[in-house]
Amino acid sequence: LEHLDPFRIPAFEQVLFAHAAPGTVILTTPNREYNVKYPALKTGALRHGDHRFEWTRQEFADWAAHVCRSYGYQVVCSGIGEEDPQVGAPTQMGVFTKCV
């Protein structure tokens, strides 16, 4: 997701969830909250030059809930990597399952 310009996300949603409409979709994206754990990363900077944005856990969960409401999916969000009690895991994942 983070490699897309934010204005392209609605089109991405349409293509993936409405037109292709696979039974299962697995998406991962950085957890912006975790960036404080990278001492060399300046405040507000993105982890990679090709990232267009990075979402907090709440922002990702809100977007995932929107996708589910709009396209008939259920989602389970979780972290990937060692989880910090305050900022969560470095990467977040959503496993979307098409409702039947």
Enumerate the predicted regions with their spans:
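Conserved P-loop NTPase "ATPase switch" module shared by AAA+ and STAND
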Residues: 1
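S-adenosyl-L-methionine-dependent methyltransferase catalytic module, highlighting the catalytic core
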Residues: 4-100
